[in-house]
Design a protein with these regions (language model features):
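Amphipathic terminal alpha-helices
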Residues: 2-3, 290-309
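SDR active-site strand-loop-helix element
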Residues: 14, 65-66, 115-121, 174-176
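NAD(P)H-binding glycine-rich loop region in Rossmannoid oxidoreductase-like domains
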Residues: 44-98
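Mid/C-terminal beta-alpha module of Rossmann-like enzyme folds, strongest
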Residues: 215-268, 272, 298-300, 307-309
């Protein structure tokens, strides 16, 4: 039996060893008002989850940073959602991107524990009502998914809808997009696009983790519920990021563009492109969040320091 703790918040993180989950663990671990644990039970095993919650006894927050977006198939490392288009990957997709998060949400609802689910905003695509690159017509938290061009987005879209329907009173459903940090790793969106041979440049909402993860933790610890679009205000295109990268990080960097039609020919699945409305994040939550272009510039300055210390 784990010892009780006097801290006001006790958090149990599923996916705490993953890229984003570990970042969240470190943020919470540095907060003297929080005791944080990395879950050892499997998120798709209800009995194990219940036993682990019973073990700690005083958990106030459960957070899910699990999910399936990449993997290795027949010896090939696939760093994109095209992994989920491979034969036999439907089970992993449904288990990790639908069943496990909903199981955690259900268990938390039964115990009146606040649950934070890291979902995605890659469930929308520009259309006649949500115009290409137009920040005034962004998808709101209440909009229903309209993009089903990949197995990943299809499953995650229905997970998003179920979080609305079943668990809105205890669950914080968080939508992020194209996560960005200053790290030189293949999970970082900037690193990804600097390594691509060709780029399809489209204005999109994106999430700068350096800035928004601490904001998310404040929202979660305040036990806010419902859905929130956790992206920096505004949109930025791939070319704009790469132009900044060339200006700030590597003056010798070059790239080539191709069309979305040409991109679709080489990918196993289509990609979501959209602008998410950030009114709730900016105004209802009272957090001062930088515009995406300003925040990306800040991250690139840090990235330069990581490459050329």
């Amino acid at each position: 039996m784990a010892q009780t703790t006097p801290t006001p918040h006790v958090a149990l993180i599923f996916g705490g060893n993953g890229w984003i989950g570990n970042k969240v663990f470190n943020i919470l671990n540095a907060n003297p008002d929080v005791t944080v644990y990395k879950a050892k039970s499997r998120a798709d095993d209800a009995d194990s989850v219940a036993k682990e919650l019973d073990c700690y006894g005083n958990v106030t927050h459960v957070m899910s940073f699990i999910g399936r977006t990449h993997g290795t198939y027949e010896g090939e490392k696939i760093t994109t959602i095209d992994y989920l288009e491979k034969p036999g990957k439907l089970v992993e997709n449904m288990r990790d991107n639908l069943f496990a998060p909903l199981l955690l949400a259900s268990v938390c609802k039964e115990r009146n524990i606040h649950f934070t689910y890291l979902g995605t905003g890659c469930i929308f695509d520009y259309d006649d009502e949500h115009k290409y690159g137009d920040v005034t017509t962004g998808f709101t938290e209440q909009d229903l998914p309209n993009f089903f061009g990949s197995s990943y987005s299809t499953v995650k879209g229905y997970t998003d809808r179920l979080m609305h329907l079943l668990n809105n009173d205890t669950t914080l459903n968080v939508r992020i997009r194209m996560p960005i940090t200053d790290e030189i790793i293949d999970r970082n969106f900037i690193t990804k696009i600097t390594n691509y041979k060709k780029i399809c440049s489209i204005p999109n909402s994106m999430t700068v983790l350096n800035e928004l993860l601490p904001v998310l933790m404040n929202i979660a610890l305040d036990k806010k519920t419902g859905t929130i679009n956790l992206t920096n205000p505004g949109v930025i295109s791939h070319n704009e990021i790469l132009e900044m990268y060339k200006d700030i990080v590597d003056p010798s960097f070059t790239w080539a563009n191709f069309t979305i039609e040409e991109q679709n020919l080489i990918l196993a699945s289509k990609r979501s492109n959209n602008c998410l409305d950030t009114t709730i994040l900016e105004y209802d939550s009272n957090y001062k969040v930088k515009n995406i272009k300003e925040s990306v510039r800040d991250v690139l300055t840090l990235m330069k320091g990581n490459i050329y210390p």
